[in-house]
Amino acid sequence: MSILEHASLMTDEIRRVPLEELQTRLARFREEMEKEHPGWQMAVINNKVNMYYFTGTMQEGALVIRPQDEILWVRRSYDRARNESLLPDIRPMQSFRTLAEFYGTWPDVMYVECRKATVDWLNMLRKYMPFKEYADIDGLLCSLRLVKSSYELELMKRSGAIHQTVLEQLAPKMIKEGISEAELAVSLYTEMLKRGSHGIARMNLPLGEDVIGVASFGKSGLVRTAFDGPGGTGGTCIAVQSIGSPFRKLKAGRLVYLDIPCGVEGYHTDKTIVYYFGDINKDPNRDLILAAHEHCIMLERFAAAMLKPGTVVEDIYNETMKQFDSRFAAGFMNGGKFLGHSIGLTMDESPAIANRFKEVLTEGMTFALEPKIALSGIGMVGSENTYLVTANGGKALTGSPHKLYCIY
């Protein structure tokens, strides 16, 4: 395929973020900046997720926003940025020197994404744009992304539909004796790609990295990882704490823990489902396994019912934990102190459903609820689904939690 043919293919087949969507986001950004930082003069967006949120493209460069204008400066790839983004003002840059020559003068305070910016990037920015100090806007950006538009929700609904189809309808057909954790995870991931998943799970956490998610059989689900989540895996090797082992094969009498991410055009949904391979009635731990799993289902449903406008986030956690059966305390969330998390352009958006989070819910927010219990010597049970905050409580986007199904 020639370069011209490739360019034509991109133009014909990509689905751009609508201009009115970008304009609304930029207007909300300026409104919130004026509230929190009256008199602000300039902000520089460098993180690719935030760049995508405001411009509809992910490139190496900088989005410079001022009260009167916004310009997307692109080092690489300028042509791709022009093709993908409907933002009117997109310009090429060689380095920050290009910006220095264009703007000429600088505010005393530059607003940047401190959590994502490297020291090297900040030093380079300050070298060519000698502002006196910088201030953080990560919290402001997070709050903007928290409430989803109808456009964003449509993408999440599409992702949720893929999630439900693959993990509820297709997974039982793939779970067979002798399959490895890695093979099962990859097979599920492939089915998601076929149906339109964008193929990656983006994280806010610096150490967060994931593509396929996790498939764990039995006790391997108890192996804790560096990632701040309840589910575990031995991974493919020491260097990769994800996917699952290519050598651990499924045998009868094991729990099958599946936490496989999905997303459409940048927007994610989160879902975990647990199956039992074999006849659970022959398992000496049958009653414990079923009781723990059903308890997680109850907790998820209870928390989901509280996902209404006006509810304080920490109240969801505290009220749900009042329903918690203390006999499962040792393994609940594998030691974590949360029930779920906001989700959208990244899997682990803030706030978490946990104590001391004071945010008040509004319609359009989306959360993943994931009560899970680690059963010592057995494996992980529980559930996870993504919900939309509505006046009637959480509306499931990925399907509802269900009982533990046995696969023979």
Predicted regions and their residues:
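Active-site neighborhoods and metal-handling regions in enzymes and metal-associated proteins
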Residues: 1-408
